[in-house]
Amino acid sequence: MKKNQSIDLLHGPIFKSLSLLAIPIMATYFIQMAYNLVDMLWIGFLGSGAVASVGVSGNFMYLANGLVNMPKIGSQALVGQSLGANNKKETKNYIEAAFQSSILFALIYGIIIIVFQKNLIQLFNLKDSTIIQDAQNYLWITCGFIIFSFVNQIFTGILTAAGHSKNTFIATTTGLVLNLILDPVLIFVCNLRVIGAALATIIAQIIVTLVFLYDAKKLDLFQEIKLLSKPDKNHISKILKIGFPPSIQSMLFTCISMYIARLISSFGAISVAVQKVGSQIESISWMAADGFSASINAFTSQNYGAKNYNRVHKGYKTGMLVVGLWGLLTSCILIFLPGPIFSCFIHESDILPYGIDYLIILGFSQLFMCIEIATQGAFNGLGKTLPPSIVSIVFTSARIPMAIVLSHFLGVNGIWWAISISSIIKGTVLVTWFILYSKRRLIA
């Protein structure tokens, strides 16, 4: 396959198409995970105060990711559908609308962060003045220049929808490698500490944007795009209508996770450490599922736009088979080999039993979490983002009362069971919903 040739999602073997599209996406996720671990390692050398300041500021990055999901997910579905229908004019209109709306969101969000940075950090009731100042500096730099991150997300969504996931892998990997190099240089050599970490992130994001722009010049997909043209309210509204539910879902998930983290911290530092390490181990499961979900999304949107409904059904079944087998494998590994796995990350014998409990309990839900993620991709590809958002918001919110009640009887394990049970329910409900929906609406 030539470098800038897209993967044909409308014809040929389905498994091959899905895999070729998913592999670069999954590789990007795993590189991102490795970067996050190394990044936290460098910041950790500055002390717990620096880690706390970056952690607090990071919450607003998560909220920003939820915001950019609105134009990203909406445009990914509609660009994919218009490509499948071979409607070049609509494809162009949706791409322009996606970039224009995301840039507007980024400017508004960045201005709010810069103006209210002090007030926003005060929400976390930090006591140490150094930590507060570091948090404010990290916040206004990373979120004040969030426009590059937003533009990169839109490029990623559109290129994936068009079958160009290899391009996104190259661009993102370039940024991650650069970030790995810049972190120690700016943090320690230039002695910029937390500010250095923030600058490394922004510089890397700018480079990623430049790589995307370089690629865009060579792709027919972007040849007639005019970002300075008058915004088309009709196309923007269609994008935002589809992207709004998952955007709210993402931001609420962040808020719920923050509350759950507070519950976990009430059981002491060991529980916090177990959750941090355990979630990194568990991410191997959902990252692979996320990669195939993005692949299923693009495959579904293009074939839905081309009215290849039978191929949509077959694509979903193929994707679910792959993701289901992966989820089953990770469930078995976490349930039957928790000790050897967790001991690779934490060696203290007093912590290991808690880590084993975490992996076993979460192991029961891996299969269901994977099929939920994959099914969300299929729904999003159809432009029907409301069902997965409803299921996620309702049952993720249920984690809070479940965690409070179960932890009263089971200790911190009750929180793990609340997370696992809710994932099992979400996977079961969403898959059932999609099967019923596709039988009624997707008739070949």
PLM segments and residue spans:
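Helix-terminus/linker motif at the lipid-water interface of multi-pass membrane proteins
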Residues: 30, 34-52, 121-129, 185-192, ...
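Residue-level signal for short hydrophobic patches within transmembrane helices
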Residues: 11, 15-34, 38, 60-67, ...
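Short alpha-helical transmembrane segments in multi-pass integral membrane proteins
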Residues: 1-22, 79-145, 189-244, 300-365, ...
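Short runs within selected transmembrane alpha-helices of multi-pass transporters and secretion channels
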Residues: 72, 141-160, 168-179, 197-212, ...
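Residue-level hotspots within the lipid-embedded alpha helices of multi-pass solute transporters
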Residues: 29-33, 66, 106, 110, ...
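Small-residue-rich hydrophobic transmembrane alpha-helices
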Residues: 51-111, 149-168, 261, 274-338, ...
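Transmembrane helical elements of multi-pass membrane transporters/channels
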Residues: 20-39, 141, 152, 175, ...
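Interfacial/gating helices of multi-pass transporter permease domains
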Residues: 43-62, 94, 129-134, 194-195, ...
